[in-house]
Structure formats: C-alpha cells, structure tokens
C-alpha cells in the first residue's frame, strides 16, 4: 500500500485498502472557517427543528475554527456569521478559535500546520 492507502486503512479500521475501495474513515481533526461554518450551523439548526438536538460534539478538542475569508467583515451578513461562529465555539466548548484581530489571525489552511494541530498521517 502507498502512504495514502495506509492512512485511510488506519482511519477506517481496515488492514488494507486499495484503489476504488469505498471507506468510512474516522477523522482526526475538523476545521471550520467563516465560509464553511455557516453551512454547518444550518445543519445543526435543521436537526434541532426536527427534534434532534445536538448538545455536544464528538470531541471539541479535535475541532478548530478560523476567521480568515470575510474579515474584516464588509457587510452585515459576514459580521453576523462571525458572531454565530463565536457563539458556536462557546456553546460547544471549542477552545481553538482563531479570531481576526485578536492576535490569533492566520490563514486556515496554514494554521493547521503552523500550530501543529494536524500531524503527518492525520485525516482532516
């Protein structure tokens, strides 16, 4: 197996995988940002309206949020989305929230490596 196949085999609990295999892999880390986050929040809201309240995450220490696409906010919707992300991180105990203008700012796709939140072999 090549390195990608080994990583996916580990994450899916299989001894091996091959091209064209369909696997369900457990992720090591989850990243949200100010573009993807609002869509995630809509799913949580939809579930709540269906009577399925999600009161906790699988592991808040494996989730991190970055504000880097629509900051500083140029319109009301972008600003509201940042507030919603902040509320989400507070409500679900996510400590790794890289807020624009708080000395924690960075590009989400490089923060993962610069802050050692994702390590070689991780699926995220």
Where do the PLM segments sit?
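Fe-S-dependent hydro-lyases/dehydratases of central metabolism
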Residues: 1-124
């Amino acid at each position: 197996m090549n390195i990608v196949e080994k990583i996916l085999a580990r994450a899916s609990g299989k001894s091996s995988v091959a091209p064209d295999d369909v696997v369900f892999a457990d992720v090591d880390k989850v990243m949200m940002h100010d573009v993807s986050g609002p869509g995630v929040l809509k799913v949580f809201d939809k579930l709540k309206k269906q009577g399925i309240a999600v009161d906790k995450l699988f592991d808040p220490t494996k989730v991190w949020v970055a504000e880097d696409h629509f900051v500083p906010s140029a319109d009301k919707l972008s600003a509201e989305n940042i507030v919603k992300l902040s509320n989400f991180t507070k409500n679900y105990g996510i400590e790794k929230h890289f807020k624009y203008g708080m000395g924690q700012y960075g590009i989400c796709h490089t923060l993962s490596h610069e802050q050692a939140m994702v390590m070689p072999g991780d699926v995220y």
